Amino acid sequence: MTPTHITSLAFPVFTQGLALGLGLIVAIGAQNAFVLRQGLRREQVATVVLFCALADALLIAAGVLGMAQALGEHPGVARALAVVGAIFLALYGWQALRRARHANALNATAGATGLGQGAALAQAAAFTLLNPHVYLDTVLLVGSIGAQQPAAMRGWFIAGASGASLFWFALLGYGARWLAPWFARPRAWQVLDGLIGVTMFLLASLLLRHALAGI
């Protein structure tokens, strides 16, 4: 198999992981507000960004590889999970489109006390690992979708989904001073939610088609 052929196969898988990762992580939430706040105050930005991105990458890899091994022995369960995943993505997309109809904004100004590296890591860990949605999103949802990919392509899917986390957290942390006024505008989040909704519906249709093709 030539490098060009490998790239042609890997790029759509990488892009799917990237789109899924961005669709799930771009949301109004405590973790994003924390990263943005650290960026605004220029406190422990590298520490917080790297921790959040690395934690996501490890959870995504564990989810994809673990689910792949489990589902490889039960193809029927794999198809069922693909259908469930498609339904979840469609519902997630529908919720995003609903949010796009209402004004909202991200508040990154709460908390005025400066943080040392240890305290910043502790808070980043709490916002990341004590949030039950992180396990639903990264381990179960991303893991089950990534496990549907051919074995040789799973690394590309993991790279895409992990790259989305690194890109988003770096954008929040290092672009905070430019992004904060934009994120404070409800209209910006309405546009983002609209794009997320469309992306989730597209991914749901791809996943459902994959599930039905295996029947």
Language model: regions and residue ranges:
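Hydrophobic/aromatic residues within the transmembrane alpha-helices of Major Facilitator Superfamily
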Residues: 18, 22, 26, 57, ...
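Juxtamembrane transmembrane-helix termini in multi-pass membrane transport proteins
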Residues: 2-79, 140-156
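Hydrophobic alpha-helical transmembrane segments of multi-pass membrane transport proteins
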Residues: 158-176
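Final/C-terminal transmembrane alpha-helix of multipass membrane proteins
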Residues: 192-211
